[in-house]
């Protein structure tokens, strides 16, 4: 997909705005034209379950035949968990919420990267991501909002930044999660958000379509079935994802048989969506060099080009601009661009995401 058009598609911000609109939360928009109010809403987020994967493997599991396929929706750039869940949680695009990728430079630091999923205690999550979440706004209007996910995510910097405001119920394992979800939906009006990462983990380690990945999808199928059977009557259950996943067969290691590290201060982002921070005064030269070397294998943009192109949305806050790479490289096809300091970790993974190919950005929107 054209990187400049990705934010013009129906995405996660449209979905959560629509859901909270049916719960009568102020200043939300019903982009799905659901029209009627609903008192119980459940949103299941399956990390790494792209539309392409559902098309190829969903028919092996009966629950995917039973669900209504509402439409294909799209992640924003970069197509990665930290950015997508922030868009889902806030209802605004990345240029506004400022969560621009897996790792970005902390402004006015000693060239320190913030890993959004692991966080850094020196960074205040509420100051880093200042936009009130839809969860916070819904609670203020009297909606019971519950976040059901693994216990390890409770209170994390990322949870506080992107998904704050909900009552967090830590639950490990299918049965515990199903019980927590059904209990939380007794209240009216109520909203439950739940997150599972097993499919993403299997895709990274073994690849989409691998035995490990199919086992994870079978467990997810079982989970959705049990949630459907256990929730109170009248609950609407939405199922979506944060990105797809590409099985990579091609790689470039920065600085190996190339001079792409010349004038580079810091490597951020991830293998399919790089934020590159450059020595002052060398930006134009470095962008030209990367563009010439990578050719059609990646799209290379300067910061100003990325902003003008609408890569992170039509509005880019000052905070977002400061965090953005001086150069942004978006891998095409199934290429990955590897940080030489992380060769073992990055090259050992089969599945990757972050780019703007259809496989990266197209995700399903399913409804019980």
Please place each PLM-identified region on the residue numbering.
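Feature captures the catalytic ectodomains and active-site-proximal regions of enzymes
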Residues: 1-368
């Amino acid at each position: 997909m054209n990187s400049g058009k990705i934010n013009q598609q129906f995405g996660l911000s449209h979905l959560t705005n629509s859901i909270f609109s049916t719960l009568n939360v102020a200043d939300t928009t019903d982009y799905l034209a659901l029209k009627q109010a609903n008192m119980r809403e459940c949103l299941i987020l399956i990390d790494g379950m792209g539309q392409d994967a559902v098309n190829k493997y969903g028919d092996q599991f009966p629950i995917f035949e039973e669900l209504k396929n509402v439409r294909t929706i799209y992640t924003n750039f970069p197509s990665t968990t930290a950015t997508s869940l922030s868009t889902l949680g806030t209802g605004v695009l990345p240029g506004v919420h400022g969560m621009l990728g897996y790792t970005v430079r902390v402004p006015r630091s000693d060239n320190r990267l913030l890993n959004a999923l692991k966080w850094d205690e020196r960074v205040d999550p509420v100051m880093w991501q200042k936009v009130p979440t839809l969860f916070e706004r819904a609670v203020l209007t009297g909606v019971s909002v519950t976040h059901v996910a693994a216990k390890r995510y409770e209170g994390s910097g990322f949870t506080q930044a992107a998904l704050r405001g909900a009552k967090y119920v830590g639950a490990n394992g299918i049965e515990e999660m199903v019980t927590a979800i059904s209990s939380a939906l007794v209240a009216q009006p109520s909203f439950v958000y739940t997150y599972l990462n097993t499919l993403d983990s299997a895709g990274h380690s073994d690849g989409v379509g691998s035995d490990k990945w199919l086992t994870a999808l079978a467990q997810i199928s079982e989970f959705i079935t049990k949630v459907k059977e256990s929730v109170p009557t009248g609950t609407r259950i939405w199922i979506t994802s944060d990105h797809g996943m590409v099985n990579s067969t091609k790689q470039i290691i920065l600085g190996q048989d190339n001079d792409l590290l010349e004038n580079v201060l810091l490597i951020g982002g991830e293998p399919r969506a790089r934020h590159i921070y450059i020595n002052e005064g060398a930006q134009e030269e470095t962008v030209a060099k990367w563009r010439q070397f990578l050719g059609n294998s990646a799209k290379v943009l300067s910061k100003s080009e990325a902003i003008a192109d609408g890569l992170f949305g039509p509005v880019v806050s000052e905070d977002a601009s400061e965090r953005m790479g001086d150069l942004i490289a978006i891998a095409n096809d199934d290429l990955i661009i590897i940080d030489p300091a992380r060769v073992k970790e990055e090259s050992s993974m089969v599945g990757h995401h972050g780019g703007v190919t259809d496989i990266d950005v197209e995700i399903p929107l399913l409804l019980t």
